[in-house]
UniProtKB/Swiss-Prot annotation:
This is Uncharacterized fimbrial-like protein YadL. The keyword Kinase does not apply. Part of the yadCKLM-htrE-yadVN fimbrial operon. Could contribute to adhesion to various surfaces in specific environmental niches. Transmembrane segments: none annotated. InterPro entries: Adhesion_dom_fimbrial, Adhesion_dom_fimbrial_sf, Adhesion_dom_sf, Bact_Fimbrial_Adh_Pro.
Length: 201
């Protein structure tokens, strides 16, 4: 249409060809449609909580009343678990668990694997420490101790924790503190604050 109108007004053939070519290019162009993608990139994670044997959330492992004879015999053990659920976006389906002190380690030089009594009470127990183990029965089989003086991560497989719950069983055991004997143990309050750190990979 544009070409024929230009011919009637006496345009040269070379101009007509140029106009025709321009018209074809104009009609061949496509529309531009904008697209904006919006998302939030998140690190893979789980919901991890500390629970007792009744699956109730806890923040304290409570031994209740303990006798010095039980401490000396290493028979006062309390079991608990880390509970993992709603896991997503974790490539290798693994969790690394580390326990670190918030008070001191056992031993006269504070160089022991157990966690020392961090109570500030005037009537606190002396020469007592707590060990934390990676199994329900301390110091047996594949059990690994969470060391106070040299914290190291323990690995947990959480591949099924996306649709189910994964438990990591542990135990705590009261013992006579390193470099001490049962004769050094005195009755009183005991508290050993520590922090579990969980990282995923």
């Amino acid at each position: 249409m544009m070409t024929f109108k230009n011919l009637r007004y006496g345009l040269s053939s070379s101009v007509v060809l140029a106009a025709s070519l321009f018209s074809v290019l104009s009609y061949a162009a496509t529309d531009s449609i904008g697209l904006t993608v919006i998302t939030t990139v998140e690190m893979g994670t789980c919901t991890a909580t500390l629970v007792n044997d009744s699956d109730q959330d806890i923040s304290v492992v409570d031994f209740g009343d303990v006798y010095i004879s039980e401490i000396n015999a290493k028979t006062k053990v309390k079991t608990f678990k880390l509970k993992f659920k709603d896991c997503a976006g974790i490539p290798n389906k693994k969790a690394q668990i580390k326990l670190t002190k918030r008070a001191t380690c056992e031993g006269t030089a504070n160089d022991g694997a157990g966690f020392a009594n961090g109570s500030t009470a005037a009537d606190k127990a002396s020469a007592v420490a707590v060990e934390v183990w990676s199994t329900v029965t301390p110091a047996t089989g594949s059990a690994t101790q969470f060391s106070c003086v040299t914290p190291a991560s323990q690995e947990v497989t959480i591949s099924t924790a996306a649709n189910a719950v994964v438990y990591y069983p542990m135990s705590a055991r009261l013992v006579v503190e390193k470099n001490k004997t049962v004769n050094n143990v005195t009755a009183g309050k005991f508290s050993a604050p520590a922090t579990f750190t969980v990282t995923y990979n």
